[in-house]
């Protein structure tokens, strides 16, 4: 009997699940707290809680992890040298001090605009080679002709031996600056991803697991570890992608919306006909716009660990994240007694100052602290301390700015009342210490003249309302959120109806189902194993490869020159993708095919089209083979779009062909099997441990 193991390292929890290959049954699952900065320790704990005999029969391991995302957000990637080729405008700051802009680049037809200044590139590479761990290069219109990027790559690799990432290798979209950022971030992640993959491989070997290793990408597809090592940037936001794929699989719904209720945030996304819906724009991470294709999602900073705090006779939810009181009481013996004794004057109340808020060290070593940070950090130890404790030790009010800075630097963590605590009070989620949650609700509710149950019910309803708002905002793009809130308020005798199933994932998913049904008319499903759906999503993700091929028509003189350039100074196109129609004299057509494999020229449109179709399918098949995916059941769909102005005659000005191949890394017989309907409870599990 063979099995497969899926692991997802999320913002709060790391989930693991084992699926039996013969029938797709989930036979074991576990959870552990995610560890920072290295998620490997949390993964080890989750694996430790699975049955050893099953682990030794595992033949495939698939991962989704926050490693890439956290590295970029925390700016802890390796130093990279950036080479910009061409005369394009840099719209903002660059993410590195090690960069150079040199002459070169191509036009929209892939013709060379200027000779590449390779000497300057070589001098730069030699100058910074001991200061960086990798290089990135982005050339103007490299998507139409990657020659200059490849030349730079070969030269820098020969001189330094460092990895070199090209923009055209990561994206076929226009936007030279965004490709440069994407290539830079990818280069930053390569050393970290190599180390992580090596650690996972060694961990599997030490447990007797002889398995192929896959990673989930942010578009919901899986990829072999070799490609993941080359393009780690594509694994950012793989967690939301895992939840989407897992929800579709567990609910047996190929088309559905998904609400993933995590500890840090709540994410809304959508699956259509078994394929994740992707964003038209690239993913934004750490404030940087990339050209990485990711799932389209609506994200709010409201999750199970969002801080609930009171000020001016009202409670607020988030946006900051804390350790729930109920969990802190289990992690730190004696915490409950400290909580009960904590007091804060009503006049001092703020997000940082609550009777229910505490602080504790994380164990990371401090590096650069200012005077205020050092002073506060000295009085925060390995046991939680309250605001009142700090006030007594400092003899002055602790700086909220310094506390927030210490939290951002991951030197301390905050503890406070959360939606998870509210569910414990209501008896709808009982994973940790209910008594601590009840004490917190009593203290905060007293400020609003509410009993613990009423206060907790209000928190739960607020969180459910935020989920409903995010769902409608996702499905009805462009609708103003205040208008959505008016309908959801229930005061207009109206209600939104969603005509596709909505799958809820996350530990507390079942607790919010009834509240969501009161707000929106929809079929809400909570499948079995909803609380480890991300781990299952990491495992059952399909192999999806998108290849774009562009055929562009241009006019050339019969002598072979580009008449358009002679008459009009070249086609008026830029990396923004804007193309201006021009008038043409009596000339011949030439058809240029642009693809990831390079460019090719034809004199007959039909020949160009035939070449493009064969090439696109070939590239999809080659990718699937390299990724170790099942080619026998591979489906390749082709969509074609022609572009031509009204005055245009003859073959289209442009023809865009998009090939989408869908395969599976696992036997095609694998489908989720359960005797229960998708919305039945999570009972009678096998080997489920927390």
PLM features per residue range, with description:
Residues 1-690:
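N-terminally biased helix-coil "hinge/interface" segments that flank
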